[in-house]
Amino acid sequence: MSSQFVYTMHRVGKVVPPKRHILKDISLSFFPGAKIGVLGLNGAGKSTLLRIMAGVDKEFEGEARPQPGIKIGYLPQEPKLEPQQTVREAVEEAVSEVKNALTRLDEVYALYADPDADFDKLAAEQANLEAIIQAHDGHNLDNQLERAADALRLPDWDAKIEHLSGGERRRVALCRLLLEKPDMLLLDEPTNHLDAESVAWLERFLHDYEGTVVAITHDRYFLDNVAGWILELDRGEGIPWEGNYSSWLEQKEKRLEQEQATENARQKSIAKELEWVRQNPKGRQAKSKARMARFDELNSGEYQKRNETNELFIPPGPRLGDKVIEVQNLTKSYGDRTLIDDLSFSIPKGAIVGIIGANGAGKSTLFRMLSGQEQPDSGSVTMGETVVLASVDQFRDSMDDKKTVWEEVSNGQDILTIGNFEIPSRAYVGRFNFKGVDQQKRVGELSGGERGRLHLAKLLQRGGNVLLLDEPTNDLDVETLRALENAILEFPGCAMVISHDRWFLDRIATHILDYGDEGKVTFYEGNFSDYEEWKKKTLGDAATQPHRIKYKRIAK
């Protein structure tokens, strides 16, 4: 293996039941300092590839090995942490060498007071310890820990791991890994469970990171701003593309032109995203306003019939009237924490509202109040007479693992009636990228992203005209994300979407609802980038820096 590479794979293959070649004959070499984003459909083998590279999965064909002496750090989708540890104890494992050096240095200083000490030996040890501390900026160790904890919005230092949610555990594991500073980072969906500000911080951190980074992610701004290479997994093959995500889109469109006969819908979807990428910010802003202006056209039967040829199609519900949702002076608390404090806003016809904020800030609580599942402490929610809600929540466990994909959606019916439309059930399921034999897969065999698509297919068949989408982008591959964006943009109704995906919010949002500290929620007209720019101008750069969320305490 050439010393110019930190890692080499030679003819790597992987077979999974029932005799499916998920990876085929992959040969790749990784440069020091390279930043690589891994793309591919759900189930394409992205996580398998990282497990092989991390040395976790040893059952594969071919060779995969790092350069001798290279330290590899791996973030799996479900990292393992010691349940009895506190958050601080778990994170400090990453800097144990520096902490031990600091402790020992204090002991060495104390030993100088002994007149019988071997001063030459102590001086040599002192020099060695100081070199370790200086290399890791050890005298500022506490500041490093606090900055990282704030940036990733970690729970309190004293919180026990066993009491944390899955998302909180992932953030702790990510923080620990980044502080270790290995030569090569293997990250499986590092942006999952991070809010937009934490993702932006991670993006800057990895952009400046001196080591090699291989990241599976669906965050396309992340792929645009960090990645210098895209590794696409397509039908078992690993195809490297030099450039970032936007560059990959350009190259991919040219390749699809050569496969036009079989890829028409996919090419149409990529072309729409490319059109958006090529627009300047003013053009993007004008496009979001144009969506609301052409609301009547979106509602026409002829337009929706044309729209049915898209990759993913959200069936329209009843025609929406002028009044949609009005929220006035809404307040909601749990225990002594105020989640929402005096919130008022009005959703105009045709709006797509992106909802952002830290995990646990109360975004899903708002949806439960809008749908009548919970009541506010004070204030009111008023729905227009024509409003029919369709809700897609972030929990996808309410499916029967023994059923096939087709059975789960269709309940055995050949024809589905969705809103004012009738559609063959297999064609409808196919719209969510379950083609042919994939419709016969058991639900229990699906990957996280495939479950996400199935969940969308089930709940969108209700045919509402106002969609409440709670983290619909979680675990979706980039292809499905793009199709979902296009489907929402063509939907003849309104949508409120909880998401941390900045690219997604920039493409679809006409308004932003931002959950800040102490129950303060801001309603802004414009997409995510417009809102961030406004925040910087209004509140300064500090406003867009992540920090651990503060809850307003209720006066006793």
Curated annotation (Swiss-Prot):
Q: Where does ATP 1 bind?
A: G40, L41, N42, G43, A44, G45, K46, S47
Positions of the ABC transporter domain: 7-260, 325-551
Reported EC number(s) for this entry are: 3.6.1.-
The places in or outside the cell where this protein is found are: Cytoplasm
Provide this UniProt record's keywords sorted from A to Z.
ATP-binding, Cytoplasm, Hydrolase, Nucleotide-binding, Protein biosynthesis, Repeat, RNA-binding, rRNA-binding, Translation regulation, tRNA-binding
Q: What residue spans carry the region label Arm?
A: 96-140
In the record, biological process GO terms are: negative regulation of translational elongation; translation
Q: Which reaction is the catalytic activity of this chain?
A: ATP + H2O = ADP + phosphate + H(+)
Q: Region PtIM: which residues?
A: 243-323
Q: Which residues bind ATP 2?
A: G357, A358, N359, G360, A361, G362, K363, S364
Q: Which GO MF term does the entry hold, naming one?
A: ATP hydrolysis activity
Pfam families documented for this protein = ABC_tran (PF00005), ABC_tran_Xtn (PF12848)
Q: Which CDD domains match?
A: ABCF_EF-3 (cd03221)
Q: How does it assemble?
A: Monomer. Probably contacts ribosomal proteins L1, L5, L33 and S7, the 16S and 23S rRNA and the P-site containing tRNA(fMet).
| Record family assignment | Belongs to the ABC transporter superfamily. ABCF family. Translational throttle EttA subfamily.
The entry's function note states: A translation factor that gates the progression of the 70S ribosomal initiation complex (IC, containing tRNA(fMet) in the P-site) into the translation elongation cycle by using a mechanism sensitive to the ATP/ADP ratio. Binds to the 70S ribosome E-site where it modulates the state of the translating ribosome during subunit translocation. ATP hydrolysis probably frees it from the ribosome, which can enter the elongation phase.
The protein depicted here goes by the name Energy-dependent translational throttle protein EttA
